């Protein structure tokens, strides 16, 4: 049991330390069934497994738009492209901090009396609505 933990840990660390490269990655997924829709005539080649360790490639010919369903376990290959992401750590000169001072903000004194008057008008309106 400890051996498998050590192997798994070393495998993960070697993947983490590996140098990144662009390219195509192909993964294989074992599915218990497969359904797809083919809008055009085509040939699908699936690896279908009759038993756990006996798998064979089998072509499925599609002559018209239809849904293809495979109920046996099969291996599905998926490929995708990997690309390296370039991270820019410096700002362009057009986005440098501004050297202009912020504008002065002044406050208006004496506005409290206007707020009190508005509150009184609201109370009177509510009282009138209740009558």
UniProtKB/Swiss-Prot annotation:
Major localization class: membrane
Cellular compartments annotated: Cell membrane
Null allele phenotype: Leads to hyperfilamentation, increased biofilm formation and reduced virulence in a mouse model of disseminated candidiasis. Also leads to increased susceptibility to antifungals (fluconazol, posaconazol or amphotericin B) that target the plasma membrane and to altered sensitivities to environmental (heat, osmotic and oxidative) stresses.
Name of the protein in question: Predicted GPI-anchored protein 26
Signal peptide: 1-18
Function summary: GPI-anchored protein involved in proper cell wall integrity. Does not seem to be directly involved in the synthesis of the cell wall. Required for normal virulence in a mouse model of disseminated candidiasis.
Organism whose genome encodes this protein: Candida albicans (strain SC5314 / ATCC MYA-2876)
Membrane topology: Lipid-anchor; GPI-anchor
């Amino acid at each position: 049991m400890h051996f498998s933990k050590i192997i798994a840990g070393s495998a993960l660390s070697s993947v983490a330390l590996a140098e990144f490269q662009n390219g195509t990655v192909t993964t294989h997924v074992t599915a218990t069934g497969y359904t797809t829709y083919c809008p055009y005539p085509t040939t699908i080649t699936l690896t279908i497994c009759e038993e756990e360790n006996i798998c064979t490639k089998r072509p499925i010919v599609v002559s018209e738009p239809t849904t293809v369903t495979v109920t046996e376990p099969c291996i599905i290959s998926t490929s995708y492209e990997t690309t390296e992401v370039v991270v820019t750590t410096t700002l362009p000169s057009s986005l440098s901090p501004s050297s202009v001072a912020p504008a002065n903000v002044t406050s208006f004194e004496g506005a409290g009396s206007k707020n009190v008057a508005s509150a009184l008008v609201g109370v009177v309106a509510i009282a009138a609505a209740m009558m």
